[in-house]
Amino acid sequence: MSRRGTAEEKTAKSDPIYRNRLVNMLVNRILKHGKKSLAYQILYRAVKKIQQKTETNPLSVLRQAIRGVTPDIAVKARRVGGSTHQVPIEIGSTQGKALAIRWLLGASRKRPGRNMAFKLSSELVDAAKGSGDAIRKKEETHRMAEANRAFAHFR
């Protein structure tokens, strides 16, 4: 047994403008090469574009998009008796949000377009409406979990 104590789970800090933890989580995932100010610029421009497109509260659109993309269940590779099985596992809310943010950013990076702010805003609006690549990724994950339901006892 380890002699070291377990690390406390840190709570996500909130961003300076919107005072929102979700926004800060998104900024930290946009971040590349330590350029946090650029990540903030990208997100704030995307939020402005969402405001112009939908004419509603952009934070509610962001929340709705993340809620729509957050998976309830995922598959994890587990090696049993020489063969690898995709075992469905339930996902907690924090891990689900992190996955949703990762999928949203991945889908927006793949989109053709001018700049990241434009692509991110388009993906967020699409996800809030229930379409887009991130939603497709969630549905695909749920389908995989359903198909491998027989291996749930390997958990």
UniProtKB/Swiss-Prot annotation:
<protein>
    <recommendedName>
        <fullName>Small ribosomal subunit protein uS7c</fullName>
    </recommendedName>
</protein>
<comment type="similarity">
    <text>Belongs to the universal ribosomal protein uS7 family.</text>
</comment>
<comment type="function">
    <text>One of the primary rRNA binding proteins, it binds directly to 16S rRNA where it nucleates assembly of the head domain of the 30S subunit.</text>
</comment>
<dbReference type="GO" id="GO:0015935">
    <property type="term" value="C:small ribosomal subunit"/>
</dbReference>
<dbReference type="InterPro" id="IPR005717">
    <property type="entry name" value="Ribosomal_uS7_bac/org-type"/>
</dbReference>
<dbReference type="InterPro" id="IPR000235">
    <property type="entry name" value="Ribosomal_uS7"/>
</dbReference>
<dbReference type="GO" id="GO:0019843">
    <property type="term" value="F:rRNA binding"/>
</dbReference>
<dbReference type="GO" id="GO:0006412">
    <property type="term" value="P:translation"/>
</dbReference>
<comment type="subunit">
    <text>Part of the 30S ribosomal subunit.</text>
</comment>
<keyword id="KW-0150">Chloroplast</keyword>
<keyword id="KW-0934">Plastid</keyword>
<dbReference type="Pfam" id="PF00177">
    <property type="entry name" value="Ribosomal_S7"/>
</dbReference>
<keyword id="KW-0699">rRNA-binding</keyword>
<dbReference type="GO" id="GO:0009507">
    <property type="term" value="C:chloroplast"/>
</dbReference>
<keyword id="KW-0689">Ribosomal protein</keyword>
<dbReference type="InterPro" id="IPR036823">
    <property type="entry name" value="Ribosomal_uS7_dom_sf"/>
</dbReference>
<keyword id="KW-0687">Ribonucleoprotein</keyword>
<dbReference type="InterPro" id="IPR020606">
    <property type="entry name" value="Ribosomal_uS7_CS"/>
</dbReference>
<dbReference type="GO" id="GO:0003735">
    <property type="term" value="F:structural constituent of ribosome"/>
</dbReference>
<keyword id="KW-0694">RNA-binding</keyword>
<dbReference type="InterPro" id="IPR023798">
    <property type="entry name" value="Ribosomal_uS7_dom"/>
</dbReference>
